Amino acid sequence: MNLIPMVVEQTPRGERSYDIYSRLLKERIIFLGSGVNDDVANVIVAQLLFLEAEDPEKDITFYINSPGGSVTAGMAIYDTMQYIKCDIATLCMGQAASMGAVLLAAGTAGKRYALPNSRIMIHQPLGGFQGQATDIEIHTKEILRIRKDLNNILAHHTGKTLKKIESDTERDNFMSSVEAQKYGLIDEVLVKREDVEGAADNG
């Protein structure tokens, strides 16, 4: 059962109700709270483009609690994050696994955060193919290309060497928020909201 809370605001013209995600969008907050698929990616890409059109100079805050999902859908979000002019602060609550971890690391340098009990996991893309040998070979080459692309992205955003990333993503690699900070996936572990305000003031 999918329950989405509604928020009621008083305006000069009377009451106006928003679903909670639309209300957060008014505050330039985007929330990824599910697996990553094409539908989810299309909504997030549209939100990013809308917020850039509204004000290309103001930051966007991107909250992430995701087990990951489709690489192609995730890359659509990633590329849009890099494409738009706005700085994007990413913040993990709960988990950021697989593609979720890539999106967390893809935030603007110095503005990537996690809450204390968050779990972050990186690994190589998964693949399970059946069919003719030639089809399996085609898919194998594609998943190896995707793995190389993802490893290059993680190397770019963490400052780690490609060889180190390749080794560390060979199997599921779970990290605490503190470990993710040391690794370079995030910049700071936040306990209170004031922490991010202080970090912004110091940036």
UniProtKB/Swiss-Prot annotation:
<feature type="active site" description="Nucleophile">
    <location>
        <position position="98"/>
    </location>
</feature>
<comment type="similarity">
    <text>Belongs to the peptidase S14 family.</text>
</comment>
<dbReference type="InterPro" id="IPR018215">
    <property type="entry name" value="ClpP_Ser_AS"/>
</dbReference>
<dbReference type="GO" id="GO:0004176">
    <property type="term" value="F:ATP-dependent peptidase activity"/>
</dbReference>
<dbReference type="InterPro" id="IPR029045">
    <property type="entry name" value="ClpP/crotonase-like_dom_sf"/>
</dbReference>
<dbReference type="GO" id="GO:0004252">
    <property type="term" value="F:serine-type endopeptidase activity"/>
</dbReference>
<comment type="subunit">
    <text>Fourteen ClpP subunits assemble into 2 heptameric rings which stack back to back to give a disk-like structure with a central cavity, resembling the structure of eukaryotic proteasomes.</text>
</comment>
<keyword id="KW-0645">Protease</keyword>
<protein>
    <recommendedName>
        <fullName>ATP-dependent Clp protease proteolytic subunit</fullName>
        <ecNumber>3.4.21.92</ecNumber>
    </recommendedName>
</protein>
<comment type="function">
    <text>Cleaves peptides in various proteins in a process that requires ATP hydrolysis. Has a chymotrypsin-like activity. Plays a major role in the degradation of misfolded proteins.</text>
</comment>
<dbReference type="InterPro" id="IPR001907">
    <property type="entry name" value="ClpP"/>
</dbReference>
<dbReference type="GO" id="GO:0051117">
    <property type="term" value="F:ATPase binding"/>
</dbReference>
<dbReference type="InterPro" id="IPR033135">
    <property type="entry name" value="ClpP_His_AS"/>
</dbReference>
<keyword id="KW-0720">Serine protease</keyword>
<dbReference type="Pfam" id="PF00574">
    <property type="entry name" value="CLP_protease"/>
</dbReference>
<dbReference type="InterPro" id="IPR023562">
    <property type="entry name" value="ClpP/TepA"/>
</dbReference>
<keyword id="KW-0963">Cytoplasm</keyword>
<dbReference type="GO" id="GO:0005737">
    <property type="term" value="C:cytoplasm"/>
</dbReference>
<dbReference type="GO" id="GO:0009368">
    <property type="term" value="C:endopeptidase Clp complex"/>
</dbReference>
<feature type="active site">
    <location>
        <position position="123"/>
    </location>
</feature>
<dbReference type="GO" id="GO:0006515">
    <property type="term" value="P:protein quality control for misfolded or incompletely synthesized proteins"/>
</dbReference>
<keyword id="KW-0378">Hydrolase</keyword>
